Design a protein with these regions (language model features):
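Positively charged n-region of N-terminal signal peptides that target proteins for export
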Residues: 1-5
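Bacterial N-terminal signal peptides
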Residues: 8-19
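Low-complexity, intrinsically disordered terminal/linker segments enriched in charged
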Residues: 176-219
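Compositionally biased, proline/threonine/alanine/serine-rich low-complexity intrinsically disordered stretches
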Residues: 24-44, 154-156, 206, 213-219
Length: 219
């Protein structure tokens, strides 16, 4: 796998969960706790959380491809990826223009696409060694930094993969991923805005549905 393909995989794949249920009226909030300043203990907790989830996903992906494995993967991704937050940030101002029914449809499609692409990406990088290289505070919580290097192509430079996380209840959720300093959320936002401007809301939904039923990895 080339470096460009790997980066593309991370950008088109990585993020976010907790099956959404939209109530009547305003769209449901994600349950995010106001963070304020994040303590050293909380930072360490976030780092340990993503390390554990990451290792569990890799362990599941090393098992034979069965319906049980697919179920385990879906459950694991739902434990650390915040689909609600990702969807809101990716749609930006468009979020407030859409009905609960439209948002429910959108988030369901986004979740399915992310799950599929995350699995493909992780499977293709099982031979990469991941190192965790520190943290930094951000407004929403903490960014946990890592790098991935191929164990078979050691001359290939490592890829940096950073996880933006925030506390939700008593746990942590990932709401953005930076691959070589490129934001997944910003990448989605740019793509979604372009499609909506050119083809309208239904055009975006149609493209997402088509993508789910095809091998094409780009919107």
């Amino acid at each position: 796998m080339t470096r460009i393909a790997l980066i593309s995989g991370f950008l088109t794949a990585s993020l976010i969960a907790a099956g959404l249920a939209f109530a009547q009226g305003a769209p449901a909030e994600s349950g995010v706790v106001a963070t304020g300043s994040i303590s050293a203990a909380q930072t360490a907790e976030a780092e340990a959380f993503i390390k554990t989830k990451h290792n569990k996903v890799r362990a599941v992906l090393r098992k034979p491809d069965t319906p049980q494995r697919a179920k385990q993967l879906t459950e694991l991704l739902g434990e650390f990826l915040d689909y609600d937050r990702l969807a809101r940030l990716s749609l930006d101002k468009e979020w407030d223009k859409r009905s609960n029914k439209e948002l429910d449809k959108f988030v369901g499609l986004l979740r399915a696409l992310v799950e599929r692409q995350y699995q493909r990406n992780m499977e293709s990088t099982l031979q990469y060694q991941v190192k965790w290289v520190g943290t930094e505070p951000i407004d929403e919580g903490v960014k946990v930094k890592s790098s991935a290097r191929s164990v078979t192509k050691k001359r290939q430079p490592p890829i940096t993969i950073d996880y933006s996380m925030h506390p939700v209840g008593k746990e942590w959720k990932v709401f953005d991923i930076f691959t070589d300093d490129v934001s997944l959320v910003k990448n989605y936002k740019r793509q979604f805005r372009r499609v909506i401007n050119e083809e309208g809301w239904q055009g975006l939904i149609d493209r997402m549905e088509k993508k789910l039923n095809a091998e094409n990895e780009l919107i």
